[in-house]
A protein has these predicted regions:
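N-terminal Rossmann-fold NAD(P) dinucleotide-binding loop
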Residues: 217
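Gly/Ala-rich phosphate-binding loop of Rossmann-like dinucleotide-binding domains
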Residues: 221, 225
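Active-site segment of extracytoplasmic enzymes that catalyze sulfate/phosphate-ester chemistry
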Residues: 35, 245-246
Length: 247
């Protein structure tokens, strides 16, 4: 059905509201925490899918490298509020933990590690402090931990307010397993862990595809819709407006 048929008498503001709601819905759908894990399979937790992201911001800057957004502790020097979520551990035992992160100043060989943060398991921090090594995105190992079967609370605790970054968390009870760090192996593995299909679902045919919800994108999508075109509007931010938004 064409937008003109769907909204024959709607004002521009009403169209913007509907487009915004659709874009936000797509953003929410894309933020999946984890699929139901098998007892002996690695458990992948996408940070942007945390039930409560607290003061951490969802940032899609490196989606071309990782295939999904990540959480960013943008606190201007003041530690941000904790991010929290719950996952299910299918089998009790000893698990190794990894966090995909980076030391964002390491590429300039700058002193200090301003993006430091902790991972808390049921309120208890792991001994490893994350975001302290590596100029590139990588899986920083967090050691071994004994986990009981059932619900588990995860908390990301920012230590500095200076751009700590967390992409994902992995738990594995296989002592020989190491998460892949490069594509295409990593992309294939992440799709498998999350239960995503190998090929994207066909969303149909459109007269116009608009990518980006900035002022230009909004105007293009609204104008095309009002002219009767079937428009696909792609937006990876939680709000519309681009550089003119509340972000």
């Amino acid at each position: 059905m064409h937008p003109k048929e769907m909204f024959p008498n709607h004002s521009t503001q009403q169209l913007i509201n509907r487009i915004g709601a659709a874009a936000i819905s797509l953003f929410a759908i894309a933020s999946v925490v984890s699929a139901a894990p098998k007892a002996d399979a690695p458990i992948l937790v996408e940070a942007e899918g945390f039930a409560d992201t607290g003061g951490w911001a969802v940032d899609p800057q490196f989606m071309d490298l990782m295939g999904s957004p990540y959480l960013l502790a943008h606190g201007l020097g003041v530690p941000v509020k904790d991010a929290n979520t719950e996952i299910n551990i299918p089998k009790a035992g000893s698990y190794r933990v990894w966090v995909r992160t980076k030391d964002w100043v390491a590429q300039w060989k700058a002193p200090g590690t301003p993006g430091k943060f902790q991972l808390l398991i049921n309120g208890k921090p792991l001994k490893t402090t994350f975001g302290t090594v590596g100029a590139q995105w990588h899986w920083q190992e967090g050691g071994k931990i004994q986990l009981a079967k059932g619900k588990l609370k995860l908390t990301l605790h920012d230590l500095t307010g200076f751009e700590g970054r967390c992409d994902a968390i992995v738990f594995s009870n296989d002592p020989t397993f190491t998460p892949p760090n490069k594509d295409p192996e990593m992309a294939s593995w992440r799709r498998q862990c999350l239960g995503h299909p190998k090929q994207p679902e066909n969303a149909g045919e459109y007269d116009l595809v608009v990518t980006g919800g900035g002022i230009a994108g909004i105007c293009a999508a609204v104008t095309a819709s009002r002219l009767g075109l079937k428009v696909a509007f792609i937006q990876d931010r939680p709000v519309l407006g681009g550089n003119n938004s509340s972000e």
